[in-house]
Every structure is written in C-alpha cells, then in structure tokens.
Amino acid sequence: MEDKKLLIYELVEELNKLAYEYYVLDNPSVSDKDYDKKYDKLVELEKETGLVLPYSPTQRVGDVVLSKFDKYTHKGKLWSLGKAQSLKEVEDWHNKNVKAVNEYNLTHDDKLPPIKYIITKKFDGLTINCTYNEDGILVTAATRGTGEIGEEITAQAKTIKTIPLKIDNDAVIEVHGEAIMTKEAFEEYNKVAVVPLKNLRNGAAGALRNLNVKETARRNLSAFFYDIGYNEGTPFKTYGEMLKFIKDHGIPMDDYAMECSTIEEIEKEINYIEEIRNKLNYDIDGAVIAVDDMKTRELLGYTVKFPKWALAYKFEAQEATTKLLEVEWNVGRSGRVTPTAILEPVEIGGVTVKRATLNNMDDIERKGVKLGSTVFLRRSNDVIPEIMGVVEESLEGSKDIEAPTTCPYCGSEIVQEGVHYFCENTLSCKPQLVKSIVHFGSREAMNIAGFSEKTAEQLFEELEIKSISDLYRIKKEDLLKLNRFGEKKAQNLIDAIESSKECDLPSFIYALGIPNVGKKTSTDLCKKFKTLDNLKKAKFEELVSVEDIGDIVAQSVLDFFNDETILKSIDELLSLGVTPKFKEEEIKENIFNGKTVVVTGSLSSFSRNEIKEKLQSLGAKVAGSVSKKTDYVLVGKDPGSKYEKALQLNIKIISEEDFKNMIG
C-alpha cells in the first residue's frame, strides 16, 4: 500500500509538470495517449488507496453544484487603478512621479533610483486572487469583490488548466491575475450553446460566478497573473523581480512586460499594444504602467481608491450597443443567401459602424435579435462587426426577422439546406454569376489583369455575359461599344483574357470555385492527381489520402465533378482554348524544403500571397499558427501574437533580410 501511495505522489508531480508543458508552454513532451494512460492510472490508485492529494489533477473538474458563494477576506488589498485616456494624462502622471523622486533625493541619503516603469497589457476579464499556502498548495481562489472582501471560487478556478494546483514555494502568497476567455474558446462554446455568450468578458465572469462547476469547465477559461498582493516570504525589491518569481514558479504570465523610463518610450509601447490588440486571441482594453522600484512605490503611496505608482491607459471600446433598423439579404457566389444587419450608426474604436454580420436564421433566433431591438456589437480585426446578442429590455415593440421565400435579386424560389438558405438559379441570378466570374478572373485564379467586379457587372448587364465560358467569346468590337472602354482598355482586357488560356492546373482548379477548396488545397490535389482528367475520376478514398483533406472537402470535390452542368461548362472552357497544365516543379535542395514556416507582420518586398507562394516553391509548408511543430517564424513589421508565441516556444525567428540571405 505504501508503494502505491508513493506512486500517487510521483504521478501527481509528473502529471502537473506535463499539464504545465501542454497548457502554459504549448510544448508537450508526451503524446495525449501517454498522458491519458498516466492519468487513468492515478484515478485507479486514488480509488484503491483513498489518498487524493489536494493538488492532484483529478481535482480540477468536479460534478459539484454549490449552494452559495462564501465570502473571502483577502490578505492583501486588490486595488483599483487610476485611469488615463490620453497621453497628456500619462505625461502629467509621469512628471509628478519624477518630481516626487527628485524632491526625495534632495533631502535623503538613501537615494531612490531614476524612475523606471514596467508596462503590461490590461486584460479584459475577471480579476481573481489565488492563495498558496506554506506547502505551495492552492488553497483558495476568490473574486476581487470590494478589493478587501470577495467571493470564494476555488472549485471554479481549479477548472482553469493553466493555474497550477501546487507550486515550489514555502511561504504563503496571494497572486492576483485575470481569468479570461480566449476568442477560440468563445467561438467553440457559442457553436453549441443554447444561449450564446455576448462577449468574452461576460463569458469569463459568468463561468466563475456559476455555482455549477461543470458549466464553468465547459467554457475552457485561461488566466494570466501579474501581481503578488501578499507575501510572507522574502520581499521583492522590484516589480521585475516579482514578475520573474511568478514566471519561474510556473504561474501563467503574459510574456509581454516592457521596461520604460521616458514618456517617449511609454508612448511607443502603448502604440505597439494598441496595434497588436486585434491580433491577440483574447481581449485587452488598455495598458498598465507600473513603477518598478518598490521603495519608490512606498514614497508615492496611495489615494483612497488606487495606488499613485500605477496607471491604466484605456483604449477605445471595441463593443457598443445600437438599434437594428432592418435586415438586408445578399446572395454569394455559391448561391447562399445571407442576412446583413442595417444599424443606426454608432462609433466603435474610432470607426462609424452602419452594418453588421448576422450569420443565418439559426444565429438570429439563438441570439434573440429582432427588428427595432437594441443589439450588442463587437468589432475585431478591422472586419465588419458582428451582432453578439440583444438587450432584453429593448424587445418590447420589436418585430421578428423573417427569412425570404424568394431570391431578393432574381425572384427564384429559395431552398433551405441545414441552417442556410440558397438560391438555386445558377443560370441567371446576377450576384452569383458576377461573383463567380470575378473569382474566376482573380489574381490567384486565372489572373485576368484589370478584371474587377465593376467590369464583371458591366459585362453581365450590357453584353449578357452569363457564364465563365462567355468571357472567352468576347470580341474587342463588343467592348468598344461600352462606356469607359476606349481602344487601349478594350485591347488590354482582350489580351489578358487570351493570355489566361495558358494556365497552370492548380490555378484553374481554384478558379472553378469548388466549395471548400482554396488555393492550397487545389495545389495539393494537383500534386496528387497531376491532370484534370485524373482529378475528375478520383475516388473518395484517394481524395482523403491527400494531406490536410478530410471527408467534407473530399465529398465537395466528388459532388462537383459529378455535376453534369459543371462538367459541360468545363468542356466548353477547354474547347475555347483554355489549356490547364500541371508543371511538376523540381525543388532544389534548400534550407526551407520540408520545413513548416509561419509568417507574421508586414514585409516590404513581398505581399502575403507572394511570400506564401515563394515559400511553397521552396518546398515549405506555410502554417497559420505557431506550434511546437513550427521550424521558422518569418517576422515583418508590426508582428502579432505569433511572434510572442515563437519566443515562448524558442522557435527560430528570422527577419525578411535573413530570409533573402538564406535563399540566396
């Protein structure tokens, strides 16, 4: 029995270490299968011996439903922060700090160091306080509450897999942090939620203040820690020392923490954080500027509400509420009919927003959105904002949104497939045809120079170009009859259409617009099947054998090439002189062949598509996210969170200049 108990201690220590590698470092040293095997063994031993350590990974998720939240008195106060919304306010605060230090040093022998700050991101989540006892065991987690008294949420916090249940420390400490919901976790939760979450912050706060711990676990929260508010161990001399302690003890901490001494340096870092804000996988709403030296903090002191030695610089909100006026239904290239919300104009992040995304009728019903109601809006990554939910109090007098029964453009009957609506009139529905023709002629497809959506609409309206093959029947004299078409422009378009006939097979496959098939998948298919005929005859088993192609894409390809109308259209293109060929490129031995590369930031010599094509021509796989499988991260100007992740995982980082030198 003693041997089994000893094994429990060993397994708990090992599993906690492996969990830290997996959830915090994102760099697992064992497979999921090996981890599960060890975990199952621990569960078996705990049942057999009755010994369950308080920091065992088996204690993270329980089926418990609590009856109430107990009050918890914090050992150290959780202060609010003073706020600034302009750089002038930050400068005034900085000047006061410098003046206070200079005045102190004039009259004291124990001089204070020159003012230095550490800037960190201001996370937009729920503040939590985790207490570790003298054995390093997590004994309590609590909300901020009043700053002095919060609510105990220990069971809920234990569901956050990045929070260690035990650390190597022999003094009681309280660690302050922010529980957050990542954008990825938010999207995954909302896919299956009966009532979708409205924003990430509410997602995190609602999870931790839920008495049903199982529901907390479903939201898959994360956490970042940034302060030790109570410490019975050796005092810290600087904030930098404190942050190093947090990181060294395996407590999750954001990697971004920059030292600054001047207002110019502070401004530079604030601007940087604001630039990368939308690229992050979680929400931030500002930057925190805190004095580094602890003795200087003592000198500066506190007001009744907040410390004078720290300041929060607040960014403009990325969320707002406004009134939904009407819904406009649009038809895409595939015939899908999708709703767009027309809104009462509102400012979000310095931009006036008048339209927002409504994905489909199912999405509208789940969110409870109605005409005339007030809705929550969220804008991220400079794309069209999305409606996240409705203000319940605004529903009185609102009207239901009704799905159209006929196409808003051609009047054809609409059919429903799953949660989506489609116009099946592929022969004469203007938006479908125009967008299909534009896609066909785009740079990554047939590369017909100077061919815009405006031109496609004009050809549709005035020359009755109703199919892709009609493009190759256009004559110069036809174009000369049109508005805005002079001799030169007409000849240029005819030449561009003619030169597009000699094309490579991957571009042609991509141009055809097979559902779920992008440029990379088109290239992968061509590498496997070599010719158009081979691809048309491909079986399901052959398609799924291609790397990165799953059941859905394989079925899309099968369905596409089993459609007689599509096959007839392809034959027409071939008869008109379009000759797609696959060139098997021999890749010369180079440093990138067979490597996985991630690109972040903007490059001066390459567009995003150009660098992707260049890397692929060298035999590299271009990935969209950084992981332990990444070999290189190519960093341009203003890199995003991928750069930070690469530093964390110790992945080789190369500049644009390095890249050019490496390929010769």
UniProtKB/Swiss-Prot annotation:
Family annotation (SMART domains): BRCT, HhH1, LIGANc
Residues annotated to bind NAD(+): 32-36, 80-81, 144, 178, 314
Superkingdom of source: Bacteria
EC top class named in words: ligase
InterPro entries: BRCT_dom, BRCT_dom_sf, DisA/LigA_HHH, DNA_ligase, DNA_ligase_CS, DNAligase_adenylation, DNAligase_N, Hlx-hairpin-Hlx_DNA-bd_motif
Record has DNA repair as a keyword: yes
Gene3D superfamilies: 5' to 3' exonuclease, C-terminal subdomain (1.10.150.20), BRCT domain (3.40.50.10190), DNA ligase/mRNA capping enzyme (3.30.470.30), Helix hairpin bin (1.10.287.610), Nucleic acid-binding proteins (2.40.50.140)
Catalyzed chemical reaction(s): NAD(+) + (deoxyribonucleotide)n-3'-hydroxyl + 5'-phospho-(deoxyribonucleotide)m = (deoxyribonucleotide)n+m + AMP + beta-nicotinamide D-nucleotide
Keyword match Ribosomal protein: no
Domain BRCT, residue spans: 587-664
BP-aspect Gene Ontology terms: DNA repair; DNA replication
Job description of the protein: DNA ligase that catalyzes the formation of phosphodiester linkages between 5'-phosphoryl and 3'-hydroxyl groups in double-stranded DNA using NAD as a coenzyme and as the energy source for the reaction. It is essential for DNA replication and repair of damaged DNA.
Protein name: DNA ligase
Organism expressing this protein natively: Clostridium novyi (strain NT)
Name of the gene encoding the protein in the UniProt record: ligA
